[in-house]
């Protein structure tokens, strides 16, 4: 989908309605943007039901996803929720942290937005903002990426890196 601030929920809906098992939301920098990302992946539910927040805003229309998943629509509605918020959920909401504001707010995001399945480090844009474009081995960039990893470990959230090589796999 588009960047986090653009709130183009329809792009997440389209991907999920085609049968994708998750969506990566780039440039998430605030609690509000992260909440919108998770909400875009969830169907609405009654307020008195468990796991209400974040309130789902995904529109209906999963016929192709049901065919792709090989299940009925009713089964799809049961399983098409975000993991780990819904233990039975099979949709993964991944947010990409790509700037210093995202790093600054990451702890609050993970504390206040249930349903984020993983964090993906956006090293290219992060290195650009830090003044070292595509210098992903620069100490300043490495320090920023290490901070993301440390926060994710502290908050017990999976963190990923898009360009894993033998030389950086342990990071």
Explain the meaning of each model-derived region.
Residues 1-171:
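Expand to "…catalyze enediolate/carbanion chemistry for C-C bond making/breaking, isomerization
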């Amino acid at each position: 989908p588009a960047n986090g601030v653009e709130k183009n929920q329809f792009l997440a809906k389209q991907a999920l309605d085609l049968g994708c098992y998750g969506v990566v939301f780039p440039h998430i920098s605030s609690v509000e943007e992260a909440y919108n990302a998770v909400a875009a992946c969830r169907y609405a539910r009654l307020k008195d039901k468990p796991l209400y927040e974040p309130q789902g805003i995904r529109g209906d229309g999963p016929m192709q996803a049901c065919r792709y998943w090989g299940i009925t629509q009713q089964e799809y509605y049961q399983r098409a929720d975000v993991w780990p918020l819904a233990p039975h959920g099979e949709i993964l909401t991944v947010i990409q942290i790509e700037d210093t504001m995202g790093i600054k707010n990451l702890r609050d995001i993970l504390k206040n937005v249930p349903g984020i399945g993983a964090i993906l480090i956006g090293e290219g844009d992060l290195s650009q903002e830090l003044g070292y474009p595509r210098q992903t081995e620069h100490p300043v960039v490495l320090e920023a990426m290490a901070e993301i990893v440390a926060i994710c470990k502290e908050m017990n959230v999976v963190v990923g890196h898009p360009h894993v090589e033998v030389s950086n796999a342990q990071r």
